[in-house]
Amino acid sequence: MEKLEKLISTYENYPKAGVSFKDVIEIVQHPSIFRQLILEMAKSKIIKEAEALISIDARGFIFGSAISIQAAKPMIVARKPGKLPGELVTKKYSLEYGENSLSIQKKALKKYNSFAIIDDLLATGGTVNCVSELINNNNKKVVGLLVVAELSKFDGRSRFNFPVESSILF
């Protein structure tokens, strides 16, 4: 999707020095392109094989919600600290530019056995690895990952034993 690539901006030294941040948010300002992206992502074999989607805080929610509606699949969320009520499963992880943790509500995780992970971007794979470990540690299965953009120089996909699909490869 050539038009899609032109809508992804690069911000140097954000959120810290040495990081080249790819921002996919402009895609949602172009409804016809956004719609086409969601239609394509929702057709994925990964989505068809999953019982539910797990979208990652926060930009993953944008794409995950739209895919969830299009594919008629339930969506649960992996959130940053302090953002979810109730009993949680939580894991820390390292980022390209720091450390964080993600949580998933236990009751949401218990309802389904197989998940497609949805996020905006794959770089080192730290965030996705955190979510996949949360899923696997609860005797559930990750059937694959869908991202809008992938930064191939980080080879994040090599960390996973499940399929990875990206709409744009940088």
UniProtKB/Swiss-Prot annotation:
One of its GO terms (molecular function) is adenine binding. It catalyses: AMP + diphosphate = 5-phospho-alpha-D-ribose 1-diphosphate + adenine. InterPro entries: Ade_phspho_trans, PRibTrfase_dom, PRTase-like, UPRTase/APRTase. One of its GO terms (biological process) is AMP salvage. Its EC number is 2.4.2.7. One of its GO terms (cellular component) is cytoplasm. Pathway: Purine metabolism; AMP biosynthesis via salvage pathway; AMP from adenine: step 1/1. It is found in: Cytoplasm. Keywords: Cytoplasm, Glycosyltransferase, Purine salvage, Transferase. Belongs to the purine/pyrimidine phosphoribosyltransferase family. Catalyzes a salvage reaction resulting in the formation of AMP, that is energically less costly than de novo synthesis. Homodimer. This is Adenine phosphoribosyltransferase. The gene is apt.
